[in-house]
Amino acid sequence: MDALNKLKQFDAYPKTLEDFRIKTCGGATVTIISGLIMLILFFSELQYYLTKEVHPELFVDTSRGDKLRINIDVIFPHMPCAYLSIDAMDVAGEQQLDVEHNLFKQRLDKDGQPVTTEAEKHDLGKEEEGVFDPSTLDPDRCESCYGAETDDLKCCNTCDDVREAYRRRGWAFKTPDTIEQCKREGFSQKMQEQKNEGCQVYGFLEVNKVAGNFHFAPGKSFQQSHVHVHDLQSFGLDNINMTHFIKHLSFGKDYPGIVNPLDDTNVAAPQASMMYQYFVKIVPTIYVKGDGEVVKTNQFSVTRHEKIANGLIGDQGLPGVFVLYELSPMMVKFTEKQRSFTHFLTGVCAIIGGVFTVAGLIDSLIYHSARAIQKKIELGKAS
């Protein structure tokens, strides 16, 4: 018994008899409010505990031989698919080789709705195929270039050959209906059919992980003196409207919290023949999920520049949308980690103890203030 009596001396929570306890409406109100506050703060702390903690690291990128995946979904509401070409270039201006891609062109009407149910597969750097079967023609034939023959190009067996001959002469290609090769391939029919249409380009590119660019521009693309240019003589600069809507553009896979700054970017061209350049800085990124899955991807920042392109074959800039990218030598690594359970318990205890203590102080203040006021009222009545 003596031991138990001595143990009672350490009780930090002395109890009072039930008969000496006073319950008030103010105390009940404080209790209810403090209980609600405890619940709100508890669920807030629980939500914070259940979210993953992400630790960033920065180091030099030493990876070699990797490919860069570019995810594209861009709409050109006033540029027909038959006019639009897509090319990927390296930093030296040469067309990239060994580019894996899966790009599609979807024709759109004036309201932005698909004209056909199936999108057309696009071959990077190649012109659209004709509607006729070339195997039905004599392979040894030599057709006319309509006065544009040169020593290097004496025979023009396709519409593209005639266009190339005209380009070399510096002639405008404005009368395809009078050229047998173009009539046979349905060149004018295709152009006229899609004249007032738009085009949606979507899919992906996988290019070498070096600085370069990819672009969307009207006209046939070709190399001239080691410079990549487009032949626009058959279009006329006044007919080129490069208004565009970038639904999605990213470099690699998505990961939690990623921000793609060009998504849902809508740019209306103020006049014809505009050249838009997006200068992109890519930061290689590794994201390690809590289950150990590793996602290799990229983040990027972007700056836009625009100007009027006055050149017909690229000597003063080309109308189009150009994305010029370069890679940072640094790599960012994000690692997901589960938050500490002991920290969660500590936070919950701090919430309960803190709210309980503050509520007790408020209740005591309310009670003693009410008692003091009541006494003054009673003294006033007595006098």
From Swiss-Prot:
Subcellular location: Endoplasmic reticulum-Golgi intermediate compartment membrane; Golgi apparatus, cis-Golgi network membrane; Endoplasmic reticulum membrane
Positions on the Lumenal side per record topology: 47-341
Cytoplasmic topological intervals: 1-25, 363-383
Keywords: Endoplasmic reticulum, ER-Golgi transport, Golgi apparatus, Membrane, Transmembrane, Transmembrane helix, Transport
Transmembrane domains' residue ranges: 26-46, 342-362
Entry-linked Pfam families: COPIIcoated_ERV (PF07970), ERGIC_N (PF13850)
Region of interest: Disordered: 110-132
Protein's job: Possible role in transport between endoplasmic reticulum and Golgi.
Annotated family: Belongs to the ERGIC family.
Annotated protein name in UniProt: Endoplasmic reticulum-Golgi intermediate compartment protein 3
